[in-house]
């Protein structure tokens, strides 16, 4: 059976924290800011941790990423 490969798209979007959790950036941040209020835009700047329900799937994509 061939080696698993790291999913390059996922690898560019997710970073591992010191405690081993996965950090990701938020969606809805590329355009259409006139329709979003200031609080919403401020909260979108903050990074978010990958949820527990998605963790297994994302870890498979990042098989060898440290």
Curated annotation (Swiss-Prot):
GO terms for molecular function: structural constituent of ribosome. InterPro entries: Ribosomal_bL35, Ribosomal_bL35-like, Ribosomal_bL35_CS, Ribosomal_bL35_sf. Residues 1-28 are annotated as: Disordered. It holds the Pfam family Ribosomal_L35p. GO terms for biological process: translation. Gene3D superfamilies: 4.10.410.60. Keywords: Ribonucleoprotein, Ribosomal protein. The keyword tRNA processing does not apply. GO terms for cellular component: cytosolic large ribosomal subunit. Residues 1-16 have a biased composition (Basic residues). Belongs to the bacterial ribosomal protein bL35 family. This is Large ribosomal subunit protein bL35. It comes from Staphylococcus epidermidis (strain ATCC 35984 / DSM 28319 / BCRC 17069 / CCUG 31568 / BM 3577 / RP62A). The gene is rpmI.
